[in-house]
Amino acid sequence: MSEFLDFLKHKYAYVAIGEFKPGKFEEAQQLYEEAISTYTHGFQGAYMLREPGTDKGIAVIFWDHIEDMEDNQNEAYQQILEKMSHLFVKPPTTTFYEVSSQIPPSVEKAEE
């Protein structure tokens, strides 16, 4: 029964899509990883994606609840965001999504 109840609990994904000034992606990535390291309660993982050959990227951060993200926006997190803000060409587009499907790799594929 607990597996069914876990299925009913939805995770949330915070998605930011943006572009950094030329040559600033690596610096932004380092600050992103620093910001992520401050997260605790409700944090379920994160990805930073980069369009090859560009300074465009997508950050995806997974949370148990939307409120968990708000709870994790502490002073250290805010200071890191301030350091990062000047690296963007323009402010990123941000949205919350409800995770509607999650498909882990099969055991056979994971062993290959």
Say what each PLM segment does.
Residues M1-G57, F62-E75, Q79, H86-E112:
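Short S/T/G/P-rich N-terminal loop/turn motif that feeds into the first structured element of a domain
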